[in-house]
Amino acid sequence: MARTIIRVPFTAGVDNTYNVVVSVLQSNGYKEISYNGETVWKKGVGLLTAMQYIKIEFEENSLIVSGWVQAGLGSKGGSEMALNGVVAAVPKKSVMKVIEEIKRSV
């Protein structure tokens, strides 16, 4: 799995932080889905641009945010791509902007 992983410390409780993150994700058009047995947030279907994914996890007082894109259509998508490099640069930048918004919000 090629994912960009960012650890974000937080001081509010887990429930409050989760609600803030969900609000940011929903306001940016992400939908909660099950993906290979994981609960993740997804935007897009891969028709015109790569599908965008964000996964959130909690570990002590840190929020762990994973982001990646996947080119292809629906469940027939290609392999996961971390948020660096030039392939699919526009959707990668879009995912990073949402992650930065999450970091500012918590």
Please give the residue ranges for each predicted region.
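Ser/Thr-rich, low-complexity intrinsically disordered terminal regions
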Residues: 1-106
